[in-house]
Amino acid sequence: MSKCSFRKWLIHSDAIQDEPLIGELYFPTLPSEIAAERTSEESHSNGESMMSMNEQQKKSLNRLTAAEMKWSARAMASLQDSIRFRYSKAWLDNGFPIGADLPLQEGLMKPLNAARLFGFLADRALDGTSALWFEQAFAMGSQGTAVPADASSIERQSILLPHCEAHAGGIRIRSTEGEAAGSTLPIPMESNAAAGIPLAIQNAERGRADLRSLLAIAAATTLPGRHSPRVVVSGRDEEVMTLSRLDDLCSIPVWREIYMRLARESGIETAQTRLKDVRGSTALLTSRIDRAAGKPLFTLSARTLTAGRMGSYLGIADILNSDGASPAEDLPKVWRRMAFALLTGAADAPERWLFVREEFGWRLAPAHGWRPNT
């Protein structure tokens, strides 16, 4: 049986003064034979940079997934089940739980119900497609971020690839040497991104991406979501750019803007949005609700704060009833948003409900988007 080694990460909050240490996270590393397989595959991909992206992705996934599955069978336990977290003593004395799956208690904890990630990591993890675009950029020679060969896919997607500064929420992850984890590529300006990113994504989706296209995508990729929201700098603030995908049945940016306008007219507090024409298609730009005056806020999703009651509006209300800073003010907002989603048929999900931590508990963050239920 292969012995599992762990990589230690330090979990801080960059939304709280002096960036206190929340705890320690331990990620299992891939065995040496799989790390060697990955290194060999990346070198092989680098020599095939003119091959279509779809072919490269398929070959990489097939080789690495087969190797990881083989090791998991030998170890008689999946790699994902081995993640560990432990709160710091100072946080145990003065902090708060950073998810329903991480109660404020001593000792090492594992994700509930054999989940792949803790909730706070799932809130920041990139989707598989975005991660693959990063991987291909590295294979073609990008020097933007150092990614260890023995890092598993979930460690890459949740720690090593989200941007070191523009990541979701207010949790910063550092190495034991104190270096902030994540991509170091500069976040693009809106004026440059409006022209470059849509074209780069179109090339990637059609299997025609080159290194320049991949870097354009990777630099703006900091947030989770199927539609690969891209972060751009507009003036002094960061905004989230949402674009359509090739397999969309309708214009997702346009329909999201329709829902946001209807919500505002219904008295629901929302993020600020605007539509922008980019190369003949439409993009939706949304203000970041996990930032205030350019600084991060400590946010967690309803999915993370409810754990076993995912998808339940009652579970969302319980967050405010049990640990809300102002439940009398926020509970009517929950009802209004619930009624809006039900009456309009808009797709709703617990990961899209964000809560901001204040001194006396959680506050409901403004709504930041619905999508058509297609």
Cite the ranges covered by each PLM segment.
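Phosphate/dinucleotide-binding and metal-coordinating scaffold of catalytic cores
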Residues: 1-374
